[in-house]
Amino acid sequence: MQTLANPSKTPINQAVFDTTIHRRKTRSVKVGDITIGGGHPVVVQSMINEDTLDIERSVAAIRRLHEIGCEIVRVTVPSIAHAKSLGEIKQKLAETYKPVPLVADVHHNGMKIALEVAKQVDKVRINPGLYVFEKPQAERNEYTQAEFEEIGDKIRQTLKPLVVSLRDQNKAMRIGVNHGSLSERMLFTYGDTPEGMVESALEFIKICESLKYYNLVISLKASRVPVMLAAYRLMVKRMDELGMPYPLHLGVTEAGDGDYGRVKSTAGIGTLLAEGIGDTIRVSLTEAPEKEIPVCYSILQALGLRKTMVEYVACPSCGRTLFNLENVLHEVREATKHLTGLDIAVMGCIVNGPGEMADADYGYVGKQSGYISLYRGREEIKKVHESQGVEELINLIKADGRWVEP
């Protein structure tokens, strides 16, 4: 019997408490000049909301996203006319800006559209539940095995020309399952479940593999975080069992807007990334697409997967705080937010400050009323009046050769 005096001797597996995220090993998939998977940095994506028939507005929207860090841009393609416009969009980007990796989003009965866009873009996204759309029958209550397989054969015949086209051009495809648009036969067979989502994706993957096409990225999105988490985890389990090391595109679809939309997306995307699952992400907000990009990079930075901005460490303030912490943090952030690769700590007092900011490159710590101490790592460099604190912090960073002008 285990007691406090006689604790268990079972050895602790230190790997369980490793502070490094060990990412799932996946194959590399090229999308234009960006690589998804294969150990490359997690890629940030978004989607424009312009009508792609409007060439000028679409080019401007793609450029706005790319300039703020969106590495792959998706566009919707509801018709053949839209598909043909993508060639002109891609050409105008190259002439007036630079090439940007583009993904075409294809849905209902999209074979002809997909074949056209495959000539124009770097990746095609298809939705297995809608690519070969079977109109629901109100009187149906089941699918026989023969009926299930018959539709499977139709899917293969419809998908094959696109797979061959992308394979021969060495372009990519995303098999993008949505919880809200599973096909009727998957719903009858597996229910409205993560299992149904996974089986829907696997059916399309197996068709691609049978045609020796492997440039695949997989997604299983849902608007409810628990469903999304379960689907991705089950997908990883099944792919590992089947030897399918395909990269995963993470997202919570229809997350909404504001704080809750950001929290909801972070709960889903961040949880999986922390488990080593995920190679590219999109935060879907009911806001301007440009507002999605900072959320993506913040998630990646918080998990230590990509460092693209200053990491600020700051205490929540308490009765020991010797200056207006909120105002000072704002001043420090405004002065240094253009820098990259630095950790800067702003701490209210010396009780916990030096210890809790030990990993920071620079520290700004309340010393006594009216004065603060500046640190380089663990070393206290100088004590200055708080009115000079931000200016002297900048001077310290400059002295170390780590400052760049905004």
Curated annotation (Swiss-Prot):
Binding site for [4Fe-4S] cluster: C315, C318, C349, E356
EC number: 1.17.7.1
Record bears the keyword Oxidoreductase: yes
One Gene Ontology MF term: 4-hydroxy-3-methylbut-2-en-1-yl diphosphate synthase activity (ferredoxin)
Cofactor binding note: Binds 1 [4Fe-4S] cluster.
UniProt keyword annotations, A-Z: 4Fe-4S, Iron, Iron-sulfur, Isoprene biosynthesis, Metal-binding, Oxidoreductase
Top-level EC class as recorded in UniProt: oxidoreductase
Pathway per the UniProt entry: Isoprenoid biosynthesis; isopentenyl diphosphate biosynthesis via DXP pathway; isopentenyl diphosphate from 1-deoxy-D-xylulose 5-phosphate: step 5/6
Keyword Iron annotated: yes
Entry-linked Pfam families: GcpE
Reactions that this protein is recorded to catalyse: (2E)-4-hydroxy-3-methylbut-2-enyl diphosphate + 2 oxidized [2Fe-2S]-[ferredoxin] + H2O = 2-C-methyl-D-erythritol 2,4-cyclic diphosphate + 2 reduced [2Fe-2S]-[ferredoxin] + H(+)
Biological process terms in GO annotation: isopentenyl diphosphate biosynthetic process, methylerythritol 4-phosphate pathway; terpenoid biosynthetic process
InterPro entries the record matches: Dihydropteroate_synth-like_sf, IspG_bac, IspG_bac-typ, NO2/SO3_Rdtase_4Fe4S_sf
Signal peptide boundaries: none
Cofactors demanded by this protein: [4Fe-4S] cluster
PANTHER family: 4-HYDROXY-3-METHYLBUT-2-EN-1-YL DIPHOSPHATE SYNTHASE, 4-HYDROXY-3-METHYLBUT-2-EN-1-YL DIPHOSPHATE SYNTHASE (FERREDOXIN), CHLOROPLASTIC
Family: Belongs to the IspG family.
NCBIfam families for this protein: ispG_gcpE, PRK00366.1
General function of this protein: Converts 2C-methyl-D-erythritol 2,4-cyclodiphosphate (ME-2,4cPP) into 1-hydroxy-2-methyl-2-(E)-butenyl 4-diphosphate.
Protein name (Swiss-Prot/TrEMBL): 4-hydroxy-3-methylbut-2-en-1-yl diphosphate synthase (ferredoxin)
Protein's organism: Trichodesmium erythraeum (strain IMS101)
UniProt lineage: Bacteria, Bacillati, Cyanobacteriota, Cyanophyceae, Oscillatoriophycideae
